[in-house]
């Protein structure tokens, strides 16, 4: 009997030893950060902001891991994007998680952090995970897993650093003080780890979300706005006011990179970096500018995705189309957990473990993106701006389901006589076009609404849009010339429209289901309740 027990114990021990070690997972996810890193300059293939920005820490992870060319969010709005990512499903399948203002989490929806927790992972988070919405950060287990006692001032980097410098500190000292919060919060999380458990940590600062200290790009980081000449996308006016605003955003992005560097350094110091799958991304494109946040153009939906970790061959550029909802099943697979059938995302572990670069999975040649409602009062009746898009390597097709509505919200003015003040448009989002954040760029474009040279920029940013949009990306990478009505593209239009609607029906998008569509009714149109 003793011999049998001994043999059973030895068998169990050997079986346990044979199990592959589960990696740690660190997810660095910045608010309102699109695809801005030096590592992407070689991918852009044309003059871009990535030729100017300095992101040595993000670039290091890209060089030691894999960088994705075609990574997209399911929705270019904070809460819906995060609902999708955490649940591994399209945003429109997450009920009240599909909107921003008024979002409520349905606890019956499985999420990867809580599933990893139940599988033995030590989980934790710092700063923004799922917000705005109630209960706060519910898909991550609420504030129980929050680590922020070292401070939150890093989230408003430019404002706080500028204040310290004005008080007599050097920028180096101000930067070090703010970055000490990042390390302190991460160290507190690691200190709570028990019995060598694998850990799953979410680092989600909001410094790249507006507002920024004006001129901080040049004053703190030495980013000369004139260096951006000829490097802005075509739909952004290449004028001093806009270049200065974009330089400020780039400064916050460089502060984000510095925070990522702190996390890397702490892992290295503890000998954990090579045991960790390290992922970097953002929840949508640049805020407060035309075609960015809240838009289905690439400037709003195409984001950075960079992954380093054990078994991931370094130095690869991956061309497969991926959606950030694919990360939930990916993290679960890495943690040895079977993704639930309800997840519509597909694990990218096969792409990460492949030795190939370029196109790896022949089926990954497109993604679907979309949006319903962002802020509550952008349009009368708190109505959404419903649209969906199909993106392939060659084309972007957009279906606007309510072309009579204003895509960025109501103008709230009719002529120069009642035009809002520049300062109000610069600082108060709800002044006009409330689905675009307040910014100097927004104010400049609105104030040039009747300027013959820039009227097209204003119309492209804020004007009503036709039911269908189609862009030929080889000829029009900035997606300015809509060719949906061009007979030469009739076959492409039909094919992409059909593929989009078929896909939406397959994944049970309410927008193409029975009428009335729930997103047009309470509680979705009651953001305050």
Place the predicted regions along the sequence by residue.
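Formylglycine-dependent sulfatase
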Residues: 2-3, 11, 16-469, 477-498, ...
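Short arginine-rich
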Residues: 505-508
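A contiguous binding-surface segment within folded domains or other stable secondary-structure elements
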Residues: 472
């Amino acid at each position: 009997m003793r011999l049998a027990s001994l043999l059973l114990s030895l068998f169990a021990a050997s079986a346990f030893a044979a199990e592959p070690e589960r990696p740690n997972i660190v997810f660095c996810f910045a608010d309102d950060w699109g695809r801005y890193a030096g590592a992407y300059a070689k991918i852009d293939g044309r003059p871009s902001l990535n030729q100017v920005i300095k992101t040595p820490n993000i670039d290091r992870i890209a060089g030691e891991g894999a960088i994705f060319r075609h990574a997209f969010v399911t929705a270019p709005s904070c809460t819906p994007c995060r609902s999708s990512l955490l649940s591994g499903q399209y945003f429109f399948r997450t009920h009240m998680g599909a909107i921003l203002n008024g979002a409520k989490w349905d606890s019956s929806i499985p999420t990867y952090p809580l599933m990893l927790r139940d599988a033995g992972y030590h989980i934790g988070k710092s700063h923004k995970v799922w917000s705005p919405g109630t209960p706060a950060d519910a898909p991550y287990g609420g504030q129980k897993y929050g680590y922020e006692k070292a401070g939150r001032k890093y989230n408003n980097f430019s404002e706080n650093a500028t204040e310290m410098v004005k008080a007599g500190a050097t920028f180096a000292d101000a930067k070090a003080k703010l970055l000490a919060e990042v390390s302190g919060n991460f160290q507190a999380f690691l200190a709570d780890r028990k019995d060598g458990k694998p850990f799953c940590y979410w680092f989600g600062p909001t410094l790249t979300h507006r507002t920024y200290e004006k001129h901080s790009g040049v004053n703190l980081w030495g980013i000369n706005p004139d260096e951006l000449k000829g490097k802005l996308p075509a739909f952004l006016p290449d004028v001093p006011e806009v270049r200065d605003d974009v330089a400020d955003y780039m400064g916050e992005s460089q502060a984000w990179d510095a925070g990522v560097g702190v996390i890397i350094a702490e892992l290295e110091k503890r000998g954990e970096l090579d045991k960790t799958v390290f992922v970097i991304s953002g929840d949508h494109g640049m805020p407060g500018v035309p075609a960015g946040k809240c838009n289905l153009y690439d400037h709003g939906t195409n984001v950075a995705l960079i992954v380093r970790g054990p078994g991931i061959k370094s130095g690869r550029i991956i061309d497969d189309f991926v959606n950030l909802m694919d990360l939930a099943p990916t993290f679960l697979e890495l943690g040895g957990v079977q993704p639930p059938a309800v997840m519509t995302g597909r694990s990218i572990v096969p792409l990460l473990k492949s030795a190939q670069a370029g196109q790896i999975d022949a089926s990954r040649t497109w993604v679907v993106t979309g949006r319903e409602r962002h802020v509550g009062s952008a349009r009368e009746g708190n109505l959404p701006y419903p649209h969906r898009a199909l993106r392939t390597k060659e084309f972007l097709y957009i279906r606007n389901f309510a072309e009579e509505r204003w895509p960025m919200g109501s103008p709230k003015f009719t002529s120069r006589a009642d035009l809002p003040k520049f300062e109000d448009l610069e600082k108060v989002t709800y002044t006009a076009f409330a689905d675009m954040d307040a910014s100097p760029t927004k104010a400049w474009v609105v104030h040039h609404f009747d300027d013959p040279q820039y009227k097209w920029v204003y119309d492209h940013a804020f004007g009503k849009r036709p039911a269908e949009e189609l862009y030929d990306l080889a000829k029009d990478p900035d997606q300015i010339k809509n060719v949906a009505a061009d007979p030469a593209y009739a076959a492409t239009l039909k094919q992409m429209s059909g593929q989009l609607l078929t896909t939406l029906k397959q994944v049970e998008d309410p927008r193409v289901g029975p009428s009335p569509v729930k997103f047009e009714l309470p509680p979705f149109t009651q953001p305050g309740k």
